[in-house]
Amino acid sequence: MNGAAVVAEILKREGTEFLACYPRNPLIEACAALNIRPILCRQERVGVGMADGYSRIKRGRKNGVFAAQAGPGIENAFPGIAQAYAENVPMLIIPAGLPLARRYVRPVFRASDVYRPVTKWSALAHTVDELPDLMRRAFHAMRSGKGGPVLVEIPNEIFEAEYKGALDYTAVKVARAAPDPDAIKEAARLLLAAKNPLLLAGQGVLYAQASEKLVALAELVPAPVATTNPGKSAIPENHPLALGASTRSRPKMFTDFMKQADVVLAIGSSLTITPFGPGVPRGKTLIHSSNDPDDINKEHRADHAVVGDAALVLDALIAEVEKQKGKGGDKALAALKDEVAAAKKAWLAEWAKHIDSDEAPLNQYRVIRDLMRTVDRDGVIVTHDSGSPREQMIPFWETTAPGSYMGWGKSTQLGYGLGITMGAKLAAPDKLAMNIMGDAAIGMTGMDIETAARNRIPILTVVFNNGVMAAERDVLPISIEKYGALAVGGNYAKVAEGLNVASLRVEKPADIVPGIKKAVSVTQSGAPFLLEFVVKEGYDFSRYPLAGL
């Protein structure tokens, strides 16, 4: 077999179900020969997004793979890979490479060198014989510790070279690290000594598939639970201890309970400071738990650290809290649930005029409300897009099942939600996969709805169309006044129709729910659907600032 066949066989043994790709790359044909389905995207960043979304929903137990052409193909993939790196998504990128003899001839693009700052691990194949070792290292990097994209650049001459002998390769297992027992004892002591403890869960809880354990610890302490943007749905948000997730916008109770907390356990989060992450205000006792020791004290001063896999940390904490606390505490738990419920009710009352609005153009919060009431939230995977949809969805979309929301925002590329939604649908075909994007975002990647139609990936794409990039109005006043700089017009339902995607444009409140039902019905038949809502130019976001960040 040649090098391409070797890599394809390894992918087969690792459980690869499809290859997101854009030609030319010899791996595409080699994978097709082994019944690994090639899915050709319109744009490389969307193909990367498909691998990303698949990896998220598979929680790193299986990994999405993207193959690109040498030179312009892998150059054009940069936005997607940078986004995945910011979000710690464990996926595999395999670009073809130009001849090794020309590697340092300008302007040859050396992918394995250029991508090193935005990958967890990056390597170049020099010989066909080293391919099994490189692939083993790549899968180990994806399945141990903190996730991240890995890249193996394979020059075409290595793909074409003959591999002699039998292939000796066994699939790589997930590696997890258990916490230090002494660190667990001190963390439990701090939580139980706190007057107002709070748990802040990141996406590490989702990757560890530890949501039930998170809820168990919260009820045992007891403590309310907030989540980061990527950690949204780590606790079902209809749980009486859930405070919701945070980007720049957040539920008011998130801010209120974080302000009064004296001890915060951040688990499964890097606590990286971004404009779209909550952070932990200064002046609190911070217990920081991550599977990557480099996260500790990176951005926040940790008063106590627990390094380990989130599921193993939670198991150990539950056992230790039970040991230190003993029986009882039901009254405290009931009182805390009542306090959270009252705070949530008051916050939603503040926003009722938006949520229940009958205005036209439509209010985005009314559309979100009707989406939540109409779809099966236990059977959905939903994501926002960059910009206003993120700020509107993160606070107000109430999740009911772990892993039912894909939050992202350390890098915030317009249009990224489309690709990851296709990947999510491929990972969980029984779920309704839905992305909410604005008119600016669809301008970036919208042509790839044709990819969904061509490949029978039945996603639901919701477009909020107000004809303007509303979130940028405050930074471009002169440009807007003199040149109308923010206007972005279009009828996206008609665009979808031209790309063989069923679609509907909704302008009246009474048509929202019937439109949603029609869209869901079409996806259930096996085809994608684009549902466009003509919405108002909105600047109302649920922003309750946290001081001391």
What do the PLM-derived regions correspond to, one by one?
Residues R102-Y104, N297-E299, A305-V307, A311-D315, ...:
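Thiamine diphosphate
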Residues N2, D129, G165-L167, R189, ...:
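Phosphate/pyrophosphate-binding active-site segments
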Residues R59-G60, G145, D376-R377, A428-D430, ...:
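Glycine-rich phosphate-binding loop signature in dinucleotide/nucleotide-binding domains
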Residues A4-V7, K12-E14, F18-L34, A342-A424:
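Active-site diphosphate/adenylate-binding microenvironment
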Residues G202-L206, D356-S357, G438-A440:
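Conserved short loop/turn motifs at secondary-structure junctions
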Residues E153-I158, G387-P389, V534-K536:
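A glycine-rich phosphate-binding loop feature that marks nucleotide/adenosyl-phosphate handling sites
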Residues G47, I74, P107, Q364, ...:
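Conserved donor sugar-nucleotide recognition element shared by glycan-biosynthetic enzymes
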Residues M1-K331, L432, T451, P458-T461, ...:
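N-terminal alpha/beta PP-like core and its mobile active-site loop of ThDP/TPP-dependent enzymes
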